[in-house]
Structures are given as C-alpha cells and as structure tokens.
Amino acid sequence: MPYFDNISTIAYEGPASKNPLAFKFYNPEEKVGDKTMEEHLRFSVAYWHTFTGDGSDPFGAGNMIRPWNKYSGMDLAKARVEAAFEFFEKLNIPFFCFHDVDIAPEGETLKETYKNLDIIVDMIEEYMKTSKTKLLWNTANLFTHPRFVHGAATSCNADVFAYAAAKVKKGLEIAKRLGAENYVFWGGREGYETLLNTDMKLELDNLARFLHMAVDYAKEIGFDGQFLIEPKPKEPTKHQYDFDVATALAFLQTYGLKDYFKFNIEANHATLAGHTFEHELRVARIHGMLGSVDANQGDMLLGWDTDEFPTDLYSTTLAMYEILKNGGLGRGGLNFDAKVRRGSFEPEDLFYAHIAGMDSFAVGLKVAHRLIEDRVFDEFIEERYKSYTEGIGREIVEGTVDFHKLEAHALQLGEIQNQSGRQERLKTLLNQYLLEVCAAR
C-alpha cells in the first residue's frame, strides 16, 4: 500500500521555485567540477530517525503520525520496509543506513532475533533489486537493550561481550549480502561513569580484541566494505572511549587497527566534543582517515545531541570544503542522521526536512568548489607560512637543523615582525562567495 500517496516525486525546480516539495539547489545531474552533484554528495536516509522514530522524549510520549504505525511486531517491520522504499524513490536518494533493531524487532532469544532479521533482509533484498537506492552502511545496536548497561565490547561481563560479537557477526553477514559500502561501529556504551569501579586498561584491550575479531571475520566471509568508527564524547555514557577523532585515532594506532578503519564523522558529535564540524573533518582528512559523514547539526544553546537537519550554510560549505580537499568520500556518503522536531509530526515533514538538508549541502558544495577553484584560502595560507619555504624555515621542515643552529639564528635576530591573520577579511570573502552562489539563478 502507498504510505505517501499525497507526495509526488521530488524534482529540482531551481532557486525561484516556491514549491516546498521541490529542490531549489540540489540538482542531481548538475556538474560541479568533474562530477555530478549526486556523485559528490552521495546522500543517505537514516532508517532509525525516519521510519522508527516516534518523537518521544524524557518528558513526553511519541506523537509522530506515521501510516505504518497501525501495525505491530513483524507486520510493522514489513510495513516500514514498504514505506522506506517508497520514500527513497520519491526523494530519489541513492543510499540508506540502518541498525539491526531498526529493521526487525529483537526476539526472546538470539536465534529468534536472527530469524526476524533474515525475514526482513529477504524483503529488503527483493526491493533493492528494482531500486536505485543502495546500502551505505549498517551496524549493530549495542546500546539500547539493558544487557548493554555496562557496555558491549567493554562490558565487565564476558557473556555480554560474546552476545555483542554475535550481533556484529550477523551484521557483517547482512552487510555482505546487501552489498553495503561500509560497516559502522559506534560505541555509545563503550566507556565508563566512574574510575572507582573501572578497569580501563582491560576495557580498552577488550575493545581492540573485539575490533580485530571483526576485521578477521570480514576477511573470512569476503566482506570488503570500509570499516568506520563514529566518535562521540558523551551521551549516553559520561566518558566514551571514542571521544573525538584524535582520541579514536590514537586508540587505532595503539592497537594496530589504523589500516582497517576510517571515521564516520557526525556534526553534532563534533560540537559535543567542543570542536567545529570542520575541525573533526580536517583532523581525519590530514591523517587519511576521512571515510563518511553523518550530516546533521546541533543547537549551540543546548548541551545534548539534538540531531537537527543541517540548514547552516556556513557549516555545509566548510564541511564540503574539507570533503572536496579529501578528493571526496570514496565509499562513504552524507547520511542524514537527523530527526524532524517533535512539533513536525506529519509525514510530509520528513520530505521537507530532507529537502532542506539536501539543498543546504548542494549550496555548500558549490561554494566550496568555487573557493577551491579560486584558491581563496590556499593563497592566503601559502603566503602566511611562506617563512617555512626558505632560509631557516625550510631547514626546519627538512630536518637539517638542531637547537644549536636555531639558537645561533635567534641570537642574530632583531625585533621579530609578525603579520596579521586577517580573519575578518577571510570571513568576508566566505560571505561573498556564499551570497554569490545563493543569488545565482
């Protein structure tokens, strides 16, 4: 049955359009550089927020109006698949993502859970045969059920470690079967509340053992998708071990895992860690670890993960700047790990939200491309660091000096003259480029 029968396929109508159910800036076939927008942006729908989210919060029950919610159990799971692929087709979106429990309910036993998953994966596989929408990534939910109260791979209970491994094993089999481009690990419960009851070294060692086993099993079954770590500093756990890109990178390097993983970077997780979105993207990029993106934004006045749809054009521009500098996202994409606000409870709000996010990143792509083409920031940065291309600076970079030679050089210096960083001028240029793209017809 149709679930969005009052919605037509969303088309590009251009900036002058007043149609709220049309793209104003995202034209999938438009070339930006040597790729189309669709190839650059690789948009993805998050199954959990879009099809299972009910709008509930700590202060109120679910209020979302969803046509499929008249069903329950496995009938509900099947209805969600039907609704999802109708949504994908009408939005003309190339990818989707899910956790295992998003697509099928857990059973009384692990075997029953596997059975439920198999039934729904069969159904998804059939839909994918005639759909352009592919699986960007899947993952195992290792945080919702009470068994994971003390963590999954970092749990103090070895039985929980084993159960988590079984879920990831099944998840990797599903990833291979559905042709997933990536597989994600997000450790929402991998951390601690207090050191008074925590063996941190054992927990970190066990987390590494767990990830090595996952790498080994992926090789065993021939799954060649990219493994992704998704950093987050807190929520639900006070001290999470994958706090930010730098922390997670140190972990991967320490345990010999760096060659097998890249990062799935979420904008709102960056701000929770006290960073900008583009900071986390830059750290990952310069270390060759930028794999995929969870596209959303947080509310700077709130201290939690609000998962809003991305509409901040400065943020999307600076994010796309890093992504283009990275040569794209490879097998990754821009997954809308975002939810409509509790007050936006009607089905069509799902379309308005995704259109807003897709248009915002389309603008960001075009602005970032022009900034890079015109070398707006590159030229300034090259001039700013010019002292390292000649004289003593070049010797520092080439590693041909020591403290003795540097001291001798410093003793010969007079008053050192620095130059302005011109931050305000550069922000004005960013504004100019953004406004020019938005004003273009």
From Swiss-Prot:
Gene3D superfamilies: Divalent-metal-dependent TIM barrel enzymes
Transmembrane spans: none
Thermal behaviour (record text): Optimum temperature is 85 degrees Celsius. Active from 60 to 100 degrees Celsius.
Localization terms from the record: Cytoplasm
GO BP, sorted A to Z: D-xylose metabolic process
Catalytic activity, as annotated: alpha-D-xylose = alpha-D-xylulofuranose
Keyword field: Carbohydrate metabolism, Cytoplasm, Isomerase, Magnesium, Metal-binding, Xylose metabolism
Location of the active site: H99, D102
Cofactor(s) for this UniProt protein: Mg(2+)
Enzyme Commission numbers on file: 5.3.1.5
Domain of life according to the entry: Bacteria
Binding site for Mg(2+) 2: E266, H269, D305, D307
Residues annotated as binding Mg(2+) 1: E230, E266, D294, D337
Molecular function as annotated in GO: magnesium ion binding; xylose isomerase activity
Signal peptide residues on this chain, from the entry's feature table: none
SUPFAM superfamilies: Xylose isomerase-like
GO CC field: cytoplasm
Cofactor binding remark: Binds 2 magnesium ions per subunit.
PANTHER family: PTHR48408, XYLOSE ISOMERASE
Annotated function: Exhibits xylose isomerase activity.
Family according to the record: Belongs to the xylose isomerase family.
Quaternary structure and partners: Homotetramer.
NCBIfam families registered for this protein in UniProt: PRK05474.1, xylose_isom_A
Protein name from the UniProt record: Xylose isomerase
